[in-house]
Amino acid sequence: MYGIEYTTVLTFLISIILLNYILKSVTSAMDFIIYRFLLIIVVVSPFVKTQNYGINVPITGSMDTAYTNSSQQETFLTSTLCLYYPIEASTQIGDTEWKGTLSQLFLTKGWPTGSVYFKEYTDIASFSIDPQFYCDYNVVLVKYNSTLELDMSELADLILNEWLCNPMDIALYYYQQTNEANKWISMGQSCTIKVCPLNTQTLGIGCTTTNTATFEEVATNEKLVITDVVDGVNHKLDVTTNTCTIRNCRKLGPRENVAKLQVGGSEVLDITADPTTTPQTERMMQINWKKWWQVFYTVVDYINQIVQVMSKRSRSFNSAAFYYRI
């Protein structure tokens, strides 16, 4: 009897010892695997270029971050300035060294050599299709033209504000604008926009949905169109999609690192009629028309005052970003 009990106890002890050994072996193996895995991650991570998404961080539209205005009581040692001008300016000046001259003049106002970039554009229409703002501060010179007032106004609305945009499939869906901040923005070589408002039965109001000739034409052969229709009403659209793209956009607020200087004209164009547009005449300024050398001299003289009403930003803006966020 005692032999059986001793055997049982001995078997139990041996089982415990064996189990403990197995657990230690497994633990050691797991530690080896984990440490080796972590070592591989540490070694490989510098060479892997992937996006860190964080933990469910919501994206609310604009990813721009406003910095404290650096123009208050210091020189612009860490800031960049882009000056956009029409090609006619360089043509009239006719001096291959004029940019270097202006850079030296900007230096006298606290802008180090190499911090000011000169960006040339052909005309308002082409600039509207592909605006690119890569500097901390961006100043756009636009010469007034009475025949281009609409283009100038829409360009100002586009570049002086941030927009959140999504693609539109006008072949499959009807669209409506929910409020005054909601606009349809079209860009392209030639944009002709026609709309047909619909009633609750999706029948055309004053138009026939199957006949685009009966649609209301709101833009003809333009390169930039910001379309505003009656809110809360579905619309069938007809757009020259082979030469134009259209996006459903929402105005988020002012883009404060961009200013527009109108050269000439009796008064600066006003885009504040839209109730969603924060009064921004501070970033829409006017210079009386003179020779282009005189215009640039004026810009140099007042550049620090101009920058005072702007805010430095950390991200660039180009036309690709426009389609989803500007």
UniProtKB/Swiss-Prot annotation:
Positions annotated to bind Ca(2+) 1: 95, 206, 214, 216
Domain of life: Viruses
Organism: Rotavirus A (isolate RVA/Human/India/116E/1986/G9P8[11])
Cited InterPro entries: VP7 (IPR001963), VP7_1 (IPR042207), VP7_2 (IPR042210)
This protein's name: Outer capsid glycoprotein VP7
rRNA processing is among the record's keywords: no
Record's subunit section: Homotrimer; disulfide-linked. 2 Ca(2+) ions bound at each subunit interface in the trimer hold the trimer together. Interacts with the intermediate capsid protein VP6. Interacts with the outer capsid protein VP5*.
Positions of the UniProt region annotated as CNP motif: 165-167
UniProt keyword annotations, A-Z: Calcium, Capsid protein, Disulfide bond, Glycoprotein, Host endoplasmic reticulum, Host-virus interaction, Metal-binding, Outer capsid protein, Signal, T=13 icosahedral capsid protein, Virion
Stretch forming the signal peptide: 1-50
Disulfide bond sites: 82-135, 165-249, 191-244, 196-207
PTM (free text): N-glycosylated. The N-terminus is blocked possibly by pyroglutamic acid.
Note: Some rotavirus strains are neuraminidase-sensitive and require sialic acid to attach to the cell surface. Some rotavirus strains are integrin-dependent. Some rotavirus strains depend on ganglioside for their entry into the host cell. Hsp70 also seems to be involved in the entry of some strains.
Stretch list, region GPR motif: 253-255
Family, per entry: Belongs to the rotavirus VP7 family.
Cellular localisation: Virion; Host endoplasmic reticulum lumen
Glycosylation positions in this chain: 69, 145
GO MF term list: metal ion binding
Main localisation: virion
